[in-house]
């Protein structure tokens, strides 16, 4: 039996994280071990806490530690504006920019014929219910400028046409770009220059 079995298992798990390959995972784990009391133990404790408390907001799909997130419960938010994003990382990117003061709806992905992802596999039915029930006046389609993102935007627009003002992000978002990788200034410029969809 290997004396590094548990360490190897940790390296294998770390290598499954986005942006970390086997070599990066190995270096990260070795660094954590060297900084046991400063990093490893607090990280393990925090991971355990997050594993027990993290959940998706029942209303919008954001991630937090309560059933309904702080954004959905904030009375200072503009109730009539709903920004639709693909995933939580996109929501967090929009929040970092500080430009949007409305509410969000996280789809949980995009429509994809290749991956057999239809509207029912995403939070699209919930979105279509939220618009009339919450008195939404504008839906901002802040989806990534990919083929699947634009296909999803068109599907949503077709289903909401005539019910609400539909806009999408404009300048600043490159074709093929993803919101999570954009700087705050680019997101701000794109949000300010949104246009009818």
Swiss-Prot record:
Family: Belongs to the RecR family.
General function of this protein: May play a role in DNA repair. It seems to be involved in an RecBC-independent recombinational process of DNA repair. It may act with RecF and RecO.
Matches recorded under InterPro entries: DNA_Rcmb_RecR, Rcmb_RecR, TOPRIM_dom, TOPRIM_RecR
Pfam families per record: RecR_C, RecR_HhH, Toprim_4
Alphabetized NCBIfam families for the sequence: recR (TIGR00615)
Top-rank taxon: Bacteria
Zinc finger (C4-type): 57-72
MF (Gene Ontology): DNA binding; zinc ion binding
Keyword Zinc-finger: yes
Name of this chain's protein: Recombination protein RecR
An example Gene Ontology biological process: DNA repair
Domain called Toprim: residue spans: 80-174
Coiled coil segments of this chain: none
Organism: Roseobacter denitrificans (strain ATCC 33942 / OCh 114) (Erythrobacter sp. (strain OCh 114))
UniProt KW keywords: DNA damage, DNA recombination, DNA repair, Metal-binding, Zinc, Zinc-finger
PANTHER family linked: RECOMBINATION PROTEIN RECR
